[in-house]
């Protein structure tokens, strides 16, 4: 009797344990079908003595490490000043973050910003960081500018833990002088992209006004066909002419057909983003046009393609403050500057031809953002909020507002 009782208890416990495992797996599946939006601060103002963190960028390595980076504005909130580039790494999909790394600039210090109208004799401005994950080599190429006048690249081959010495690549911008005598150069901001042929492409903007001005400006790309060993200039994608006023701060992504879609900020009258496409990412750009669904509050935006290998079909995602300026009657003010708030995300199933389901990530103060995705399809958005840079984690169910995607 004792043996039989023990045996029955053992069988009961085993069956109960298996039932718990089954229910746990079932609840996990149910949870995967539910919408997800959660947030964590990554770069709050005041951390490490930094007055303000701005200009976020984000990539996910081939091994799934999340790299978040931005400008660390040491002494002021201004674009010009003592600025470094800081980075944090996440090994759990953006839920927790390792300590801050100061990754640029670690070459010869270059003070006395020649592009600043007044002051700055002892300042070094490191600006506009852009990372690209080379999915053929696993390395991370990282570009940034110095004093809005010179451009450098560094590389990591260990998931962003250590970085190479900087190499200057300013010569890549010289061909643009044939059309515009630029005085200011800037990469991105945000992230670059890699085409199916291995080419690395980074959006850039250049300005040719008076010292201290970021306008008039125009947009193009630089590229590397040898895994970041050498960089060259592409053709101008969005010139400063006609109805396109001072285009700058572009973001690009690949399309389902292997081409490149470029989305550009400007101060043009329609208050809409400028879009153009290219099959190569460097030339043959289509005639720029304003996209009626992409509002322009005069703020950098992010765009990202999630390939059909992750979901059943390709998605393009787009984030920016969904705002335009309006008068007291609610009528749009041409060439107005919308308030930087209401950071929203929308998606496209047709390579950016049309956009659906505008969802609000941050209703309050919010501005620049950058998008990435994890191998399991979780979408990450690193964005500027009120005195902080935050990482939002979300799934496609939340973005589309539909379950079972």
PLM feature spans:
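N-terminal secretory signal peptides that target proteins for export/translocation
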Residues: 1-13
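Bacterial N-terminal signal peptides
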Residues: 14-26
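Sec/Tat signal peptide C-region and signal peptidase I cleavage site
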Residues: 29-31
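Asp-box/BNR beta-propeller blade signature and adjacent active/binding-site loops
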Residues: 33-405
């Amino acid at each position: 009797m004792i043996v039989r009782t023990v045996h029955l208890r053992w069988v009961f416990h085993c069956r109960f344990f298996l039932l718990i495992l089954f229910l746990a797996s079932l609840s996990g599946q149910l949870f995967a079908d539910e919408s997800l939006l959660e947030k964590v601060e990554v770069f709050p103002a005041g951390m490490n003595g930094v007055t303000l963190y701005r200009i976020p960028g984000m990539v996910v390595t081939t091994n799934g490490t999340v790299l978040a980076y931005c400008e660390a504005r040491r002494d002021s909130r201004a674009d010009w000043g003592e600025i470094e580039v800081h980075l944090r790494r996440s090994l759990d999909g953006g839920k927790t973050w390792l300590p801050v790394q100061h990754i640029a600039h670690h070459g010869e210090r270059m003070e006395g910003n020649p592009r600043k109208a007044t002051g700055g004799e002892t300042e070094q401005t490191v600006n506009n960081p852009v990372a690209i994950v080379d999915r053929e080599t696993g390395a991370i190429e990282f570009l940034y500018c110095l004093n809005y006048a010179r451009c450098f690249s560094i590389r990591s081959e260990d998931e962003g833990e250590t970085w190479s010495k900087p190499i200057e690549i300013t010569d890549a911008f010289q061909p643009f002088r044939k059309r515009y005598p630029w005085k200011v150069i800037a990469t991105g901001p945000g992230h670059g992209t890699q085409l199916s042929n291995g080419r690395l492409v980074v959006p850039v903007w250049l300005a040719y006004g008076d010292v201290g001005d970021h306008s008039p400006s125009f947009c193009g790309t630089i590229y590397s066909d040898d895994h970041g060993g050498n960089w060259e200039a592409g053709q101008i994608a969005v010139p400063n002419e006609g109805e396109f006023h001072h285009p700058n701060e572009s973001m690009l992504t690949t399309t389902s057909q292997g081409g490149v879609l470029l989305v550009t900020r400007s101060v043009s009258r329609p208050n809409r983003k400028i879009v153009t496409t290219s099959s190569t990412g460097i030339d043959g750009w289509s005639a720029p046009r304003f996209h009626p669904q992409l509002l322009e509050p005069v703020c950098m935006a992010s765009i990202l393609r999630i390939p059909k290998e992750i979901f059943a079909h390709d998605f393009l995602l787009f984030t920016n403050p969904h705002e335009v300026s309006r008068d007291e009657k609610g009528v749009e003010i041409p060439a107005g500057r919308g308030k930087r708030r209401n950071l929203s995300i929308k998606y496209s199933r047709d390579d950016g031809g049309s956009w659906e389901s505008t969802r609000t990530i941050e209703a309050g103060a919010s501005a620049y953002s950058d998008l990435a995705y994890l191998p399991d399809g979780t979408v990450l958005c690193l964005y500027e909020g009120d005195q902080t840079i935050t990482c939002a984690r979300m799934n496609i169910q939340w973005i589309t507002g539909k379950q079972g995607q």
